[in-house]
Amino acid sequence: MMKRKFIFLLFALCAMIVSAQNTKYVNMFMGSSGDNGQLAPGATVPFGVICVCPDSDPNTHAGYNYETTKVTGISINRLSGVGCSGGGGNIRIRPLHPSKELHINKKTERAVPGYYATAFTNGIQTKLTATNQMAVEKYLYPKEIPAALWIDFSSCFEADATYEYSQAAPTILEGFIHAKTVCGRGMYKLYFSLNTDKPFKLKEIDGEQPCLDFGNDVRKVEVRIAVSALSTDVARKECARWNKYSFNRLKKNSYKEWKELLATVDVKGGTDDDKAIFYTSLYRACLSPVDVTSADGRYLGTDGKVYRADGFRYYSNWSLWDTFRTKFPLLILLKPGQMRDIATSLLHLYRTGKKDWATLDESTPTVRTEHAVILLLDAYRKGITDLDFNIGYAGMKEEMERLLMRKPDQKMEAACDLWAMAQISEIMGKKEDAILYKERAERLFEETWKKEFMNIDASYEIMKGNGLYQGTRWQYRWAAPQFLDKMIEWVGKDTLCAQLSYFFDNHLYNQGNEPDIHVPYIFNRLGAPEKTQQLVRNLMTEPMIHKYGGNAEFKKPYFGKAFKNHPIGYSPEMDEDDGTMSAWYAFGALGFYPMLVGDEHYELTSPLFDKIVLRLENGNKLTIQTVDRVQKDMPIRSVTFNGSKVENFRISHNELIKGGKLIFNY
């Protein structure tokens, strides 16, 4: 018996050691160069409000640009891989007078999950870490440079913020900033408490940024900036919570959070680059939404009122037009407890006031909230059944009446929302509503698809043709997999499969934007699973021809990989979009994908790795394994789950989370 216990403990210890190594694969600089992802290597915790990082000059949407050494300073927040001018970039600190240039010494730059450090070419060093709502910044000065910090309270990636501040103590500044969200579609207000470990003299000169002067004898300064959407008092208390924790302790805590999160998935096989892209993708998928709940359990509603979060944590910072497709399905799989809180937050968002983009009373920078009903249905279908839809049902109904339907793509997306709303109504026992929304969805799809997308002609290849948003008619043709059976009925299965083959053979697919990223998996449903397997593998690992960027057709097609373990981590103009593209890659690597969000089934494809182990939150373990695969592009012969054959290359989420072995035979 003792021998058995020893062996068990030994295996458990080995598993912990292997999992602890997963963080080493995260490439914090992947996708941080130019317009190839729009990402940053900032210090943050999972789903943290703070992401503290240098801002490049000129900057990108996330503030940081790997290929640029010149920086304007270090700001406390940013969104990951989003469009327009990005979001955040607030409370920017500069450890050198603004009249003098500040350049990163690239040889000294280092970043791991939860920590960033670099030296500047003038000898000043900075080290950065974070808690959920507090940036921690350490500055080390050479003897010849006096310790001083210049603060730009107006800094914001979207437009200058308005602000107020005052000195509350010899080591404390407090106030607020009021800034625009992404694309200028809304506003957020952050109260802050800025604390230093040494007293400073506040210098305020007209036309210049306020300066914190620490005197000639100080060589090290630590700054802590806590924020809250509620009040300076809450921000002050948030800062005080961590008084007993040193910089190194906070750094270790942040790293530990990431280590534990990434330990939920272990892989064997594949190349080091495969592992780096995979674990970096898991990391990127867990940056948002962010937990804005105060320590005493309160949050700011989008109606400007303060509420108590009873029995859940309140999340903000949305980019749902992108992320409902992949990121949230991934979180439902890996973090269902957290997804319950995220879904509950969305229901309360409907209650307090939800716009398609943002309100004037946001808690953080945010982007878009369309298709929340599909996300909520997906969570419910995949086992998060203790959601109180009554909280947001009135708001959902109101949203269904104002869905945009001016353009063909809007009509296709509206049909998908109505489809989801019909099912939520059915779940709630509202039969009449369910029938109404189902009929509206089916009628709208039929009218739109038959008129705009059924009869193919040369205009289908034109980006933004017929007013489409960031896509072509070819790409939006497949945008509503909810109605795939109707497409098959109207066109014929063989014809539709041939048209889909033409779509890919002629490079009309766009991996660089969201409307068609599910389309490789449609081959599964058309009886050609080997094409899904080949396409997904090639898109993940091989150089391919890419004709389209985010908003236009390239003058010359780009030939290369869409995903690379490199600062130029994505194809040109491919925004990572707040975890969307990362989650797309992660699902492909796992060997299954949520082609139809709102349905519990996954489409199977060939896993990237030879063996994958998922430690599910319910305590079960799912092992995914390949058998007799001697070449990476071999087609799958059959799939079994716990010994039973899986039919049609589809499997349900609710079966997978029971745990067991998913075996791919070649």
Language-model features: locations:
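Short coil-to-beta strand junction motifs in C2/discoidin
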Residues: 607-609, 631-635
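Bacterial Sec-dependent N-terminal signal peptides
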Residues: 1-21
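Hydrophobic, small-residue-rich alpha-helical packing segments that form membrane-like cores
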Residues: 413-417
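Long, well-ordered, tryptophan-enriched scaffold segments
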Residues: 448-457, 462-464
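Accessory carbohydrate-recognition regions in carbohydrate-active enzymes
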Residues: 21-328, 332-374, 381-404, 408-412, ...
